[in-house]
Amino acid sequence: MATTDNVIERWNKLENPVPVTYNRNLVGIDIGGRKAHFKNENDQIVTESYDFIHIAPPQSAILPVVNSALAVQEDGPQKGWLNVSKDTLQHKVFPNVFGLGDTNGTPRGKTAATVKKSTPIVVHNLLHVIHGKPADKKFDGYTSCPLLIREGSAMLIEFDYDGNLIPSLPVIEPLKDSYLAWLLKYALLKPAYVATLKGHV
């Protein structure tokens, strides 16, 4: 079952689901009035009231990639990101360039888990290219997303490019919240994130 199928099925069972709107960018907030102003795909400003708002800023690759021939040039969701094959993570124009992590123009996987799983593939393929062989090892797009449900409970969802579940820990049910998934997030992942911020990883 694809992850998205499960999410849609559960969403449809909610009595009052939150409305989902696409193709709008946040352009302003009236904090006192609890109003968020969005620009829609027709360049019209749409204002919505809110009780709670969580904002994810627009994402892009680093400017040295965006402003170079290394970036995807064609319009679309990958424009500006590193122009790599989603399978080999080898650059589509410059065969001696490979990508890792959140600068890649791949359909999914801008997480630390993606970097961890894709690094051995990139190393293998890079060594092959150095020795005159083709990059032959393929990456499935693995990514992992620990979702906190509440204090002491989380879901660990692991999936590939197509949204298919590919759990790596058999003791954690990917579509059910559990204390074990929460413990993994707080006991292992959180210290790793903090160490990374301090430059220790």
Task: Name every feature range the model reports, one short phrase each.
Residues 1-24:
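Rossmann-like dinucleotide-binding cores of NAD(P)H-dependent redox enzymes
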Residues 22-35:
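A conserved short coil-to-beta-strand element within the FAD-binding core of flavoproteins
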Residues 32-39, 77-83:
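Short gly/ser/thr-rich secondary-structure transition/capping motifs
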Residues 39-46:
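A structured beta-alpha segment of the ubiquitous adenosine-cofactor-binding alpha/beta core
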Residues 46-117:
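FAD-site-proximal beta/loop scaffold in flavoenzymes
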Residues 47, 156-201:
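C-terminal auxiliary extensions adjacent to catalytic cores
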Residues 80-98, 149-169:
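FAD-binding beta-loop-beta segment adjacent to the flavin cofactor pocket
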Residues 100-149:
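A conserved FAD-binding loop/helix module that cradles the flavin
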